[in-house]
Amino acid sequence: MKTFTAKPETVKRDWFVVDAAGQTLGRLATEIASRLRGKHKPEYTPHVDTGDYIVVINAEQVRVTGAKTTDKMYYSHSGFPGGIKSINFEKLIAKAPERVIETAVKGMLPKNPLGRDMYRKLKVYAGAAHPHTAQQPQELKI
């Protein structure tokens, strides 16, 4: 019996919507990253993108435990000397709530072209509204 490997053209991708309200950031991000990779499917193949599309709503209501609200820092660099910027979780969730979930999930995906393709299937929105109703996403309980 030959080992099964999924072909990129035969992979069936579903759409799921996840409500982040009241969810813990890390636990939510690990489940999303796993589903973006396709590890929940029996036809999972490491070198093929077998994952589903994930739409995350209510990103502004995600929570963290402990003192991470004030202590967790996010860093970015402009590329120029001395161009490092830092912002804590509390300020970032007020400024750009989508970036908190996007950053957490992106860090859990492979750092290669396949990982970038997986990351493109993640859609994050601050509020409850999203423009993907035409895809008829199924609700995913995490």
UniProtKB/Swiss-Prot annotation:
One short Pfam name that applies is: Ribosomal_L13
Q: Which GO terms describe its biological process?
A: negative regulation of translation; translation
Q: Which residues form a coiled coil?
A: none
Q: Which UniProt keywords apply?
A: Ribonucleoprotein, Ribosomal protein
The UniProt entry, under Gene3D superfamilies, shows: Ribosomal protein L13
**PROSITE patterns in the cross-refs:** RIBOSOMAL_L13
InterPro entries listed in its UniProt record: Ribosomal_uL13, Ribosomal_uL13_bac-type, Ribosomal_uL13_CS, Ribosomal_uL13_sf
Per the record, its GO cellular-component terms are: cytosolic large ribosomal subunit
What protein family is recorded? Answer: Belongs to the universal ribosomal protein uL13 family.
Q: What protein am I looking at?
A: Large ribosomal subunit protein uL13
Species of provenance: Pseudomonas fluorescens (strain ATCC BAA-477 / NRRL B-23932 / Pf-5)
